[in-house]
A protein has these predicted regions:
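Hydrophobic structural segments
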Residues: 1-135
Length: 135
């Protein structure tokens, strides 16, 4: 699991999804959501990259929302149904590439500090495999 934390101010699931869409680079997938648009979100669990293997993790289950990537149909459907019946997080599914893109500049800065004689570059190549979606 990447991180679990609390938002500075509670917001709705819909507002959080919009905020993510505004911060992440645009992708064909956008931000997919499972849960009540107006649900109040305070506690966030996050896993960059593919994270459906953590859907049953107690920290994820205790959060109001789980933000990750590459959610597969059956694990996401089961988590959604479980959340409706027994409580659990809403889901926000973002592009794998976009979820990892956020930390590249930070990682580069840390590498530059640790290896001052090495040239550290951050690629600007977009590696998201999807070019467009038709809805």
């Amino acid at each position: 699991l990447g991180r679990v934390g609390r938002l500075a101010q509670p917001m709705t699931l819909g507002a959080l999804a919009r905020a993510l869409a505004d911060v992440l680079p645009a992708t064909a997938q956008g931000v997919r959501a499972a849960g009540d648009f107006d649900r109040t979100i305070e506690t966030v669990a996050l896993c960059a990259g593919a994270g459906d293997s953590l859907l049953s993790d107690p920290q994820v289950r205790a959060a109001d929302v789980y933000i990750t990537s590459d959610l597969r149909h059956h694990p996401a459907s089961e988590a959604r149904e479980s959340s409706r019946l027994r409580g659990g997080p809403a889901l926000l599914d973002v592009s794998h590439w976009a979820s990892e893109w956020l930390w590249l500049d930070t990682a580069a800065a840390q590498l530059r500090a640790a290896l001052p004689t090495a040239e550290v570059l951050v690629s600007e190549l977009r590696t998201d495999p999807w070019d467009f979606a038709i809805v």
